[in-house]
């Protein structure tokens, strides 16, 4: 992971110098390391879910950085997907059916190496809506798509949830982890069907516009997933030293300040937060003899010893990070989904000779 950070650090530095190019090789490599194919360009970005904003502001739990405490599941990536489905027209009376909606969420951004630990569907109504009448909800998983012009067959669906509810100032949440896990394979993602009925007492056995209008006007659906990328996860972390390093000569290997401003690399339109971060970098000489302050490895100590004897044949050790820490990024991906992701080894805390 230290090698990955060094690559990211170098690419960030090069981007600061070469940002005049539309998309440089360094930027493509950096975006790939961040799990993106191209630079996102959100046109009509979705609002950031409060749950993601709260997790970002709370920060990473240094003792357990790969646990999403807000959801109680392992993970270091949270994505919020907007519904790309459509509302079906109800042309003929169908009892007390108020709404039929096809839901579709594109999970193609989830990589094969990720372990999906939570899939949560949210059905939200306008916040100032309050109606006391009761409705009935049925949620189906589509097993097979119907041909255009053909009736939706009940044989092509599987009932997942049935629930009664009232329109209150809160959302409805449903655990769809198993379904979302299957959707990592696009061939299995046929979407969902949501049906909402008015209670038969209020609807009088037939659909009533007055009763159904609140549902049709104010419904909003989204899907949230939590996944774990094992390659970007450390289960144990040494606690950061609280004492400050003693003064050192300016040419000796040590941590130097480097602030990365995402506006400087042209990323301000898709990176939601932070606006930038203190990345730092390592620079300086590793002279003989290495002192304890330089945190040299055994190999580096031997290398400096050999260099003192044969300076022309053996170079001095390199100044490199010996301790790094993670950051969280909140951003829009290539599908305009909101993503919260923890990245290991993005901040240099200490440097040494290697």
From Swiss-Prot:
<dbReference type="GO" id="GO:0005576">
    <property type="term" value="C:extracellular region"/>
</dbReference>
<dbReference type="GO" id="GO:0048339">
    <property type="term" value="P:paraxial mesoderm development"/>
</dbReference>
<feature type="signal peptide">
    <location>
        <begin position="1"/>
        <end position="20"/>
    </location>
</feature>
<dbReference type="Pfam" id="PF00019">
    <property type="entry name" value="TGF_beta"/>
</dbReference>
<keyword id="KW-0963">Cytoplasm</keyword>
<dbReference type="InterPro" id="IPR015615">
    <property type="entry name" value="TGF-beta-rel"/>
</dbReference>
<protein>
    <recommendedName>
        <fullName>Growth/differentiation factor 3</fullName>
    </recommendedName>
</protein>
<dbReference type="GO" id="GO:0016015">
    <property type="term" value="F:morphogen activity"/>
</dbReference>
<dbReference type="GO" id="GO:0005125">
    <property type="term" value="F:cytokine activity"/>
</dbReference>
<dbReference type="GO" id="GO:0005615">
    <property type="term" value="C:extracellular space"/>
</dbReference>
<keyword id="KW-0339">Growth factor</keyword>
<dbReference type="GO" id="GO:0001707">
    <property type="term" value="P:mesoderm formation"/>
</dbReference>
<keyword id="KW-1015">Disulfide bond</keyword>
<feature type="disulfide bond">
    <location>
        <begin position="253"/>
        <end position="319"/>
    </location>
</feature>
<keyword id="KW-0202">Cytokine</keyword>
<dbReference type="GO" id="GO:0070986">
    <property type="term" value="P:left/right axis specification"/>
</dbReference>
<dbReference type="GO" id="GO:0007368">
    <property type="term" value="P:determination of left/right symmetry"/>
</dbReference>
<feature type="propeptide">
    <location>
        <begin position="21"/>
        <end position="240"/>
    </location>
</feature>
<dbReference type="GO" id="GO:0048332">
    <property type="term" value="P:mesoderm morphogenesis"/>
</dbReference>
<keyword id="KW-0732">Signal</keyword>
<dbReference type="InterPro" id="IPR001839">
    <property type="entry name" value="TGF-b_C"/>
</dbReference>
<dbReference type="InterPro" id="IPR017948">
    <property type="entry name" value="TGFb_CS"/>
</dbReference>
<dbReference type="Pfam" id="PF00688">
    <property type="entry name" value="TGFb_propeptide"/>
</dbReference>
<feature type="disulfide bond">
    <location>
        <begin position="286"/>
        <end position="353"/>
    </location>
</feature>
<keyword id="KW-0165">Cleavage on pair of basic residues</keyword>
<dbReference type="InterPro" id="IPR001111">
    <property type="entry name" value="TGF-b_propeptide"/>
</dbReference>
<comment type="similarity">
    <text>Belongs to the TGF-beta family.</text>
</comment>
<comment type="subunit">
    <text>Homodimer; disulfide-linked. Also forms heterodimers with other TGF-beta family members including nodal2/nr-2 and bmp4.</text>
</comment>
<feature type="glycosylation site" description="N-linked (GlcNAc...) asparagine">
    <location>
        <position position="175"/>
    </location>
</feature>
<dbReference type="GO" id="GO:0003140">
    <property type="term" value="P:determination of left/right asymmetry in lateral mesoderm"/>
</dbReference>
<feature type="disulfide bond">
    <location>
        <begin position="282"/>
        <end position="351"/>
    </location>
</feature>
<keyword id="KW-0964">Secreted</keyword>
<comment type="function">
    <text>Required for posterior mesoderm formation during embryogenesis. Acts indirectly to suppress head formation by altering mesodermal patterning. Also involved in the establishment of left-right axis asymmetry, acting upstream of nodal/nr-1. Can exert long-range effects in the embryo.</text>
</comment>
<keyword id="KW-0325">Glycoprotein</keyword>
<dbReference type="GO" id="GO:0008083">
    <property type="term" value="F:growth factor activity"/>
</dbReference>
<keyword id="KW-0217">Developmental protein</keyword>
<dbReference type="InterPro" id="IPR029034">
    <property type="entry name" value="Cystine-knot_cytokine"/>
</dbReference>
<dbReference type="GO" id="GO:0009952">
    <property type="term" value="P:anterior/posterior pattern specification"/>
</dbReference>
<dbReference type="GO" id="GO:1900107">
    <property type="term" value="P:regulation of nodal signaling pathway"/>
</dbReference>
<feature type="glycosylation site" description="N-linked (GlcNAc...) asparagine">
    <location>
        <position position="206"/>
    </location>
</feature>
<dbReference type="GO" id="GO:0042803">
    <property type="term" value="F:protein homodimerization activity"/>
</dbReference>
<dbReference type="GO" id="GO:0005737">
    <property type="term" value="C:cytoplasm"/>
</dbReference>
